[in-house]
């Protein structure tokens, strides 16, 4: 009887061990690094974007995607499903299959555009673009409590698109793609403190993600026309930066890892990547190569959502803002593990031993999710890989306080991973580059006849024009460094390429000659302009039409009548025998001593007391004209 029970125990242990290791080795959920949504399925991809597995083939309108990394659960939506709008997908490692359950029932004619998950309170957030609202609900009480409205944008006509949760600072970020009033906003997870953080120079923002490593947000902006942009800012909207601007794409959602930004493109039905900007760049004189976006994978169907493993358990354990959140999440998972039945058998002890052996380097095994929570500085399905493994190319790697690898480069190298050689393409024309071990400064050892900090000057071509000029004019000025070269060229009877002659000769002309040449040029230009101005003015004077001369004729009588005191030009017209005509210009050019044109009574009285032999003065003409005008008007 005892023998039989012993055999049964051995068989049970072997059966459990085989069923335990097989899922871990073959169907571990850590086997994928990215997940994307096509219209009718989910694809799980490795870090090289090769398809590992697929799921959810029974759906027809999948778009948005969210990932609960603590429980290894994928949340996705289906626009075409009749009853539910959001579903959960969990991988069952024991049977190597996926279990799909309805998470949120459809609310009217809602249309889910973005999904986000909070691992601390286990709340699911989603943006409904059609109803202009942002909802949230607890995944633990979805069957008993309906979803609640966190933000209502219907009154202002908003169009919430992408959503992202800052799990450390307890904030929800979303993009508002309303035309002409687009923005990026945030609000507390408790529904208070709504704030618009980006509203200038933004067209149609789509996906948004939080980078806890750099405390920044990244979002996609589908610009007007053919362009799109990836932009970044601090969590409060300050320090806005343009990460990438490109064209001919239709970006939808994005994800971010330690080093790279990923986004889905509906136009090319592909996933693209671009390096994430470093927080601090080492200042060097070398020019970094221009980086272009890389197309990682493409399909025949439209691609929408994308999520990536961030490993926030490992990386955020020592973060000032995130440490408490990570601790609470781990504590909740540990409590769930400890709530298992207290009745232990030899099989349970053996399983626990296998669990401890499966996760390496002090990692914690999570039974429900069938994965390992690694210690700081390790990664992999079993935490078997050091973060510093092959990370620094030419330097020493250390794990920072945040849990990320950091490189200390050798003197000759720089870059985030010490991948760039300082002397690369620094010295020209075959010069040899060396780096000072103490200061890190670069210097060039140039070949013969080459000078400059980077050996950029060719002395042979530089002095060729002087040598040519010296050949024609033996007394011409030649710089001292060129004398030996000219002598060498004379002995070898060599000629210099003509294209170098003019530029070299002019660039190295003595300073006093250069100054004289500049003065002569300036004086010549000014003189030419003055001559042109004089010629133009002369032509204008010659061809300008003359001003017309105004002529006016007055009819006056030669002698005044006896009763001339009451005569006026209108009541007493002169007779034909008494009148005469004179032009006003001629009248104005005469005075009273000459032939008077008009001799009214007033003028005679003014001149009656004057000596008749006295010479005429200029005032006579003024009085004559004045009285003539008055009498004519009267």
UniProtKB/Swiss-Prot annotation:
Keyword Coiled coil applies: no
UniProt xrefs under PROSITE patterns: EGF_1, EGF_2, EGF_3, LDLRB
Keyword GTP-binding recorded: no
SUPFAM superfamilies (alphabetical): EGF/Laminin (SSF57196), YWTD domain (SSF63825)
UniProt-listed Gene3D superfamilies: Laminin, TolB, C-terminal domain
Positions of glycan attachment: 83, 109, 190, 285, 339, 449, 458, 493
Cytoplasmic side: 537-634
GO molecular function, one term: Wnt receptor activity
Disulfide bridges in this chain: 359-372, 374-383, 423-433, 427-444, 446-455
Membrane topology: Single-pass type I membrane protein
Record field: transmembrane: 516-536
Signal peptide: 1-27
Any GO CC annotation of this UniProt entry: plasma membrane
Keywords: Cell membrane, Differentiation, Disulfide bond, EGF-like domain, Glycoprotein, Membrane, Oogenesis, Repeat, Signal, Spermatogenesis, Transmembrane, Transmembrane helix
Biological role stated in the UniProt entry: Has a role in spermatogenesis and oogenesis.
Protein's UniProt name: Protein cueball
């Amino acid at each position: 009887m005892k023998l039989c029970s012993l055999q049964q125990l051995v068989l049970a242990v072997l059966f459990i061990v085989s069923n335990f290791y097989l899922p871990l080795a073959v169907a571990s959920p850590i086997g994928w690094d990215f997940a994307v949504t096509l219209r009718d399925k989910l694809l799980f991809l490795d870090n090289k974007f090769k398809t590992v597995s697929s799921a959810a083939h029974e759906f027809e309108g999948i778009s948005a995607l969210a990932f609960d990394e603590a429980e290894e659960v994928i949340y996705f939506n289906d626009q075409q499903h009749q009853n539910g709008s959001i579903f959960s997908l969990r991988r069952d490692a024991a049977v190597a299959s996926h279990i799909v359950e309805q998470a949120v029932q459809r609310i009217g004619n809602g249309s889910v555009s973005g999904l986000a998950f909070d691992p601390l309170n286990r709340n699911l957030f989603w943006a409904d673009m059609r109803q202009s609202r942002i909802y949230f609900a607890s995944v633990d009480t979805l069957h008993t409590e309906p979803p609640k409205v966190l933000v209502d944008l219907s009154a202002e006509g908003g169009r919430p698109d992408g959503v992202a949760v800052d799990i450390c600072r307890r904030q929800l970020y979303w993009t508002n793609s309303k035309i002409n009033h687009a923005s990026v906003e945030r609000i507390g997870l408790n529904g208070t403190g709504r704030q618009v953080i980006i509203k200038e120079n933004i067209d149609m923002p789509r996906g948004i993600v939080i980078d806890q490593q750099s405390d920044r947000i990244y979002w996609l902006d589908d610009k007007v026309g053919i362009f799109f942009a990836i932009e970044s800012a601090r969590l409060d909207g300050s320090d806005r930066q343009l990460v990438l601007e490109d064209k001919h794409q239709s970006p939808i959602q994005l994800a971010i890892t330690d080093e790279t930004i990923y986004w889905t493109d509906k136009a090319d039905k592909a996933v693209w990547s671009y390096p994430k900007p470093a927080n601090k760049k080492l200042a060097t004189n070398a020019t970094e190569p221009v980086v272009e976006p890389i197309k990682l994978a493409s399909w025949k169907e439209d691609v929408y959502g994308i999520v990536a493993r961030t490993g926030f358990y490992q990386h955020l354990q020592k973060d000032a803002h995130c440490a408490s959140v990570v601790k609470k999440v781990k504590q909740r998972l540990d409590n769930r593990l400890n709530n298992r039945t207290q009745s232990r058998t030899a099989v349970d002890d053996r399983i626990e031993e296998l669990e401890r052996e499966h996760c390496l380097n002090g990692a914690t095994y999570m039974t429900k999710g069938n994965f390992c929570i690694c210690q700081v500085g390790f990664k992999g399905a079993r935490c078997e890989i050091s973060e510093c493994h092959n990370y620094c190319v030419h330097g020493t790697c250390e794990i920072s306080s945040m849990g990320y690898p950091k490189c200390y480069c050798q003197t000759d190298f720089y870059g985030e991973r010490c991948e760039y050689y300082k002397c690369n393409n620094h010295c020209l024309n075959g010069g040899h580059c060396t780096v000072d071990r103490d200061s890190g400064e670069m210097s060039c050892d140039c070949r013969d006849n080459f000078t400059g900090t980077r050996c950029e000057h060719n002395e042979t071509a530089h002095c060729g024009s002087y040598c040519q000029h010296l050949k024609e004019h033996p007394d011409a000025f030649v710089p001292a460094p060129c004398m030996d070269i000219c002598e060498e060229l004379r002995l070898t009877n060599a000629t210099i390429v003509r294209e170098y002659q003019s530029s070299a000769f002019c660039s190295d002309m003595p300073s006093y000659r250069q100054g004289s040449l500049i003065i002569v040029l300036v004086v010549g230009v000014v003189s030419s302009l003055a001559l042109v101005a004089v010629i133009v003015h002369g032509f204008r004077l010659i061809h300008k039409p003359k001003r017309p001369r105004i002529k006016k004729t007055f009819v006056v009588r030669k002698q005044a009548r006896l009763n001339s005191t009451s005569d006026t030009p209108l009541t007493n017209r002169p007779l034909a025998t008494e009148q005469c005509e004179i032009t006003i210009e001629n009248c104005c050019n005469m005075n009273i001593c000459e032939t008077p044109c008009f001799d009214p009574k007033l003028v005679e009285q003014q001149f009656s007391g004057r000596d008749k032999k006295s010479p005429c003065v200029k005032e006579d003409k003024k009085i004559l004209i004045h009285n003539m005008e008055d009498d004519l008007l009267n």
